[in-house]
Curated annotation (Swiss-Prot):
Gene Ontology MF: a single term: mRNA 5'-UTR binding
Protein name, per record: Translational regulator CsrA
HAMAP family: CsrA
Subcellular location: Cytoplasm
SUPFAM superfamilies membership: CsrA-like
Quaternary state and interactors: Homodimer; the beta-strands of each monomer intercalate to form a hydrophobic core, while the alpha-helices form wings that extend away from the core.
Broad class of where this protein is predominantly found: cytoplasm
GO cellular component, one term: cytosol
Pfam families per UniProt: CsrA
Single GO biological process annotation from the record: negative regulation of translational initiation
Chain's role: A translational regulator that binds mRNA to regulate translation initiation and/or mRNA stability. Usually binds in the 5'-UTR at or near the Shine-Dalgarno sequence preventing ribosome-binding, thus repressing translation. Its main target seems to be the major flagellin gene, while its function is anatagonized by FliW.
NCBIfam families according to UniProt: csrA, PRK01712.1
Length: 78
């Protein structure tokens, strides 16, 4: 991990198209401005971790799930 020190108003460039800038320092909180192309997905770490967990949970299925879906789409005998 690269660790850098920045002062208020200073920035960091990532690649050719992302700039991070320190916009406010208040108490124990730092506000960071991010200038990046719209096609770049930017998430807070805790949100990204929740997205990953929910995607993993949604991708899990059991044979009971398959049976339930099958019973919904299979023609029922009369």
């Amino acid at each position: 991990m690269l660790v850098l020190s920045r002062k208020l108003g200073e920035g960091i460039v990532i690649g050719d198209d992302i700039v991070l800038k320190i916009v406010e320092i208040k108490g124990g909180t730092i506000r960071i401005g991010i200038d990046a192309p719209l096609d770049k997905k930017i998430y807070r770490q805790e949100v990204y971790q929740r997205i990953i967990a929910e995607n993993q949970e949604a991708s899990q299925w059991s044979i009971d799930d398959l049976d339930a879906i099958s019973s919904l789409i299979s023609p029922q005998p009369k």
